[in-house]
Amino acid sequence: MKISKLLNGILCSVFCLNTLIGCSGESPYKQIAKAQTLDYNGIPVYIEPDEKTLQMTIDKYFEQLEKQPDYLMKNCTEIHFQCEDIFIKRMLDEGFVQNETEAELISGSTTNTTVYMNTRTKKLGSIDVDENDFKETLTHELWHVYDDTHQIGDSYPSDNVQIVSIYNQNPSLLGEYGATNTLEFFAEAGEMYIYEPDKLKEKSIDLYNYFESLPKE
């Protein structure tokens, strides 16, 4: 009698577990993400996955939105979380890059007030990408949006005389990518201003003070 009750209990537990994770036995941590539109404080976040995009990855990346400064997020009107194939296709179609090799080096991009984020977990086939990498890339892209929405006359924050002067003195001050142009120099400096302010001060106190002076309302 006790054995029968025990077996019934085990069967019941198995049934309940299958109900939770599906009869296929698929772990909820391995569930594939579905195309959907999420909302973050009024900002639509479009999820554009493929058959390899895990919901767990989307959840982790979505959490990075709340770690962004409000004064950066408020300028953004929409965000796209794109699987690598969709992200690369858009980069090629819109002429941002000349070939897939160039596109594979890029983790995020912006068009005016829209941010596009590559949701891959590896780049170049073997380099791991985690939520912290995603967070920092998102911050970089949001500084581009900030730059695009804070024009004063014919001048943008990234082509301010102070930025241009510091950049011209040492284009590689913030690394190879920052040396690309003043737009990337500005976004790289903005990212460092948020996550490594002391490091930015060491590299250029004038650059740090410039970011301190920017409007953050």
Where do the model's predicted regions map?
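C-terminal motif of bacterial Sec signal peptides marking the signal peptidase cleavage site
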Residues: 20-22
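Short pre-active-site segment immediately N-terminal to the catalytic Zn-binding motif
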Residues: 117-138
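Bacterial signal peptide processing site
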Residues: 24-26
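Hydrophobic (often cysteine-bearing) scaffold residues that line and stabilize catalytic clefts
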Residues: 8, 131, 135, 183
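Metalloprotease/metallohydrolase-associated module, dominated by Zn2+-dependent proteases
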Residues: 158-217
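Auxiliary, metal-adjacent structural segments of Zn-dependent hydrolase domains
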Residues: 40-116
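Bacterial N-terminal signal peptides that target proteins for export
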Residues: 1-10
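Catalytic Zn2+-binding segment of zinc metalloproteases
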Residues: 141-158
